[in-house]
Amino acid sequence: MYPNKNSQQTFAEIMLVSVTLFWGATFPIVKEAIELLPVMAFLWIRFALAALLLGFMAGRRGFATLDYRGWCNGILLGTLLFLSYLFQTFGLEQTSSANAGFLTGLNVVWVPLLAGPLLKKPAAFGAKVGVIIAFSGLILLTWHTPWTLNPGDLLVLACSFFVALHILGLDRFTAGYDARALTFVQIFTMAVLGCIGSLIFEPVSWPREWPLSLVSAFLITAILATAYAFWAMTRFQRLTTPTRAALIYTLEPVWAAIFSVWLLDERLSSLAWAGGGLIVSGMIFAEAWPLLRRRSSGVEPDLKMN
């Protein structure tokens, strides 16, 4: 299908870009949906629909690639994903979808910092500078008088940490397994955890009417932002590096802000836009630093290098 490794990696990275588009678009969609349905109820229904689709796509042949370790890997990855969505969706109740998009994108700074202790790859100078730049942006984005962090912002910040763990986990635990089957295990795990949490913590009162906006939210988030997105991540992220993948994911908050302004008519102050720009700049600096360093030393960069 691909003439060489570079074109294979390029195609994989284009697929990951499409993932960020669908994720960014769902921020305003989910924000409206959780006004009609409790958070965990919305999550488990979304994930259950996506799991049904993925299970059908994987088929018997796909599940045959999963051994005991494969199932355990999928459950672990699914648990990390569930925690990220839980913190993000609760955070959306208390902050703007644009803020949530930018803050979720901070996972790209966590990745190189966590890669040191978890994958024995210490953080580079660029990652440390990126953290400083992004943290400055965080202060501007969430600035109030007097300055405080919105509780919703803190929840989404926790979400970004678990997203980073999931990115690192995909790099380590997915090789050798059918992407659709392994993604099914992840999403099914999320559906089960969400259902249990909803039954325990949420007195669900189902809407008397299911408006088109809620039905559309389920279909869009289940099919495009869950089934397709995590299949694409599981299938294609291993064809690039965690660092390059994390850099691509910096597009998510940009899409989130664009769709939030377009669909919800949200308005960000110039200070907030500047903060969001600094966050994205910090993300890009952290991930582009190795490439810039190799070029300045006259070494031809290898796309597959960290």
Report each predicted region and the residues it spans.
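Glycine-/small-residue-enriched transmembrane alpha-helix faces in small-molecule transporters
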Residues: 1-41, 79, 87, 145-172, ...
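Hydrophobic alpha-helical transmembrane segments of multi-pass integral membrane proteins
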Residues: 10-15, 41-56, 76, 126-133, ...
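Hydrophobic/small/kink-forming positions within alpha-helical transmembrane segments
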Residues: 21-24, 28, 55, 78, ...
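Specific transmembrane alpha-helical segments of multi-pass solute transporters/efflux pumps
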Residues: 22, 26-27, 55-104, 140, ...
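Helix-helix packing/entry segments at the starts of transmembrane helices
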Residues: 43-45, 86, 100-106, 170-192, ...
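C-terminal transmembrane-helix exit sites in multi-pass transporters
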Residues: 53-62, 107-129, 254-274
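Hydrophobic transmembrane alpha-helices of multi-pass small-molecule transport proteins
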Residues: 54, 75, 123-143, 159-163, ...
